[in-house]
């Protein structure tokens, strides 16, 4: 690759796509010809790993090249591991540098079409401190939150009954505190500052509004379509969003075809509620989920066709992936609505099991990368940041730890061994698993210190709660569960000192790596604190009259870019 080439860059990220859902990764029941075409014309990674098994922390790591614990984009609570309210005050800190910001500074036109889910506002409704336009994107068209079942009035809300119960219990407990404090104050037993009473009363009110709004306002408040800083649909028309996003992406490519551009197309597919166009309904052999996968593949094809029509294909790096593994728990009666993770154990929300973090990884750049290559080395979504920095002709900043590695030597065939020696797999703030890729051989060891408890037992998922816990209802392993992933990728045969002579030395090496890794961590504000994640009326984006927000400006505005 010539460093002054500055290719166009198109990043395609699916939402909750299982690595086993694509034909090029072994699926024979769903048709994905366009993604398969990318794989046959490019390089396919078979051990490509998300930095987290949940969307928000995974996307934060993807954009910054850093473990999400470094930016505070992880939760210490099982209740909130991704943002549940658009009117919260947490988000990707503005002092984090995204690859979009790097490329923007190097002359690229940058656009994000689709899902964001990394926060919106800090202190007031319109400050938009976490907005994509404050993280290096010139243009944004999409959903600042995400697509949930709540966005369809006819579907069961994803704010589950157990969450509502916890919100109600918290409301009652917090409401009792100021009441109990008023008794000694008025009885003059001892003095209680009014400020303390007010704080507890305010918290009780916020928890109450979160509980109350979960019964009817979530669609109106969370399901919003924006162009740059403007709300254009509230609530969004979920059945039309995919078509609108595709139209915007094609317009972006056409507008900037004569200058280097970065287009990050962040699909709403294949997250539940699996909304597909009529022409795709019933098309696949795998029900509603398969229909949604096939519609996503069709959209990929339209983007590739646009690059071909504009004669940009040879000068464009195209990358396809997913933010995490398939979600196993969503059900419609007895029918599973989530994806398939192939031979890999576990799924979305499970900190260390392969099924939650092993994702597709496909790169196509016809003028640079050899077609049809397959790479089995451990790689990470965090690698995109340093890779794009290299491609864009820049040098990585030295003022922070970057956990990703430049993939170009591996992709071009100039290197045969991944630069990742250790990878750390977190579940929220808790380190669950460590992966060690030995420098002198192809062996990849994986040690689980914590694993989730499946319910019902033996099902391989957490159907009782909708998603597995990071702490509390988990199993701690001492010594850890050890697997040789290079020989046992399904994690079916745990090793022990009796059947693996290197067991003790491998564990010792990993524990030394954990200590070294933890020395590189510095305290940062936690974006998933209780205060940051609860709903705040003064932060709620609203087009129209609050709280009955609503508008539809989409028909009045044509696709555009700055």
From Swiss-Prot:
Transmembrane segments: 167-187, 189-209
Cofactor binding note from Swiss-Prot or TrEMBL: Binds 1 Ca(2+) ion per subunit.
Coiled-coil segments on the chain, per record: none
Recorded GO CC terms: endoplasmic reticulum lumen; membrane
InterPro entries in the cross-refs: Alkaline_phosphatase_core_sf, Sulfatase, Sulfatase_CS, Sulfatase_N
Residues the entry annotates as binding substrate: 115, 271, 348
Top-level taxon in the UniProt lineage: Eukaryota
Positions contributing to Ca(2+) binding: 15-16, 55, 323-324
Protein name: Arylsulfatase H
Gene name of the record: ARSH
């Amino acid at each position: 690759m010539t460093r002054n080439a500055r290719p166009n860059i198109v990043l395609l990220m699916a939402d909750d796509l299982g690595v086993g859902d694509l034909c090029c990764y072994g699926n024979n029941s769903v048709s994905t010809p366009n993604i398969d075409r990318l794989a046959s014309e490019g390089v396919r990674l078979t051990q490509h790993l998300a930095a987290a098994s949940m969307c928000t922390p995974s996307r934060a790591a993807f954009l910054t090249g850093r473990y999400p614990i470094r930016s505070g984009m992880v939760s210490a609570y099982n209740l909130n591991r991704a943002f549940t309210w658009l009117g919260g005050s947490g988000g990707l800190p503005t002092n984090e540098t995204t690859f979009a910001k790097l490329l923007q500074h190097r002359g690229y036109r940058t656009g994000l079409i689709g899902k964001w889910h990394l926060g919106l506002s800090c202190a007031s409704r319109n400050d938009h401190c976490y907005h994509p336009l404050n993280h290096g994107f010139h243009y944004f068209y999409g959903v600042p939150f995400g697509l949930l079942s709540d966005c369809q009035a006819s579907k069961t809300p994803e704010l589950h009954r157990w969450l509502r119960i916890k919100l109600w219990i918290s409301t009652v407990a917090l409401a009792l505190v100021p009441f109990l404090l008023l008794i000694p104050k008025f009885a003059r037993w001892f003095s209680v500052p009014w400020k303390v009473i007010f704080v507890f009363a305010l918290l009780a009110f916020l928890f109450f509004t979160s509980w109350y709004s979960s019964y009817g306002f979530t669609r109106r408040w969370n399901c919003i379509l924006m162009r740059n800083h403007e709300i254009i649909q509230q609530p969004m028309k979920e059945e039309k969003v995919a078509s609108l996003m595709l139209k915007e992406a094609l317009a972006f490519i056409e507008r900037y075809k004569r200058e280097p551009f970065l287009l990050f197309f962040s699909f709403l597919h294949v997250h539940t509620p699996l909304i597909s166009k009529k022409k795709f309904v019933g098309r696949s052999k795998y029900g509603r989920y398969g229909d949604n996968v096939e519609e996503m593949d069709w959209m990929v094809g339209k983007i590739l066709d646009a690059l071909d029509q504009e004669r940009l294909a040879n000068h464009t790096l195209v990358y396809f992936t997913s933010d995490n593994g398939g979600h196993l728990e969503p059900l419609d009666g007895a029918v599973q609505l989530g994806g398939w993770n192939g031979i890999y154990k576990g799924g979305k929300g499970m900190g260390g099991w392969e099924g939650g973090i092993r994702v597709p990884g496909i790169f196509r750049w016809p003028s640079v990368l050899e077609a049809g290559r397959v790479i089995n080395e451990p790689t990470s979504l965090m690698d995109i940041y340093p890779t794009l920095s290299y491609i864009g002709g820049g040098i990585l900043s030295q003022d922070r730890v970057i956990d990703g590695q430049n993939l170009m030597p591996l992709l071009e065939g100039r290197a045969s061994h991944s630069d990742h020696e250790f990878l750390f797999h977190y579940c929220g703030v808790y380190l669950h698993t460590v992966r060690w890729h030995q420098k002198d051989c192809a062996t990849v060891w994986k040690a689980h210190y914590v694993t989730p408890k499946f319910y019902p037992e033996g099902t391989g998922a957490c159907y009782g709660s909708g998603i597995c816990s990071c702490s509390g209802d988990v199993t701690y392993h001492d010594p850890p569960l050890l697997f040789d992933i290079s020989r046992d990728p399904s994690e079916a045969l745990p090793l022990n000192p009796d059947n693996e002579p290197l067991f003790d030395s491998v564990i010792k090496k990993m524990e030394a790596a954990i200590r070294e890794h933890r020395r590189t961590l510095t305290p940062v504000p936690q974006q998933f604190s209780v205060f940051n994640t609860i709903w705040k009326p003064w932060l709620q984006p609203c087009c129209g009259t609050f709280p009955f927000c609503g508008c539809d400006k989409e028909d009045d505005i044509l696709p555009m870019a700055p």
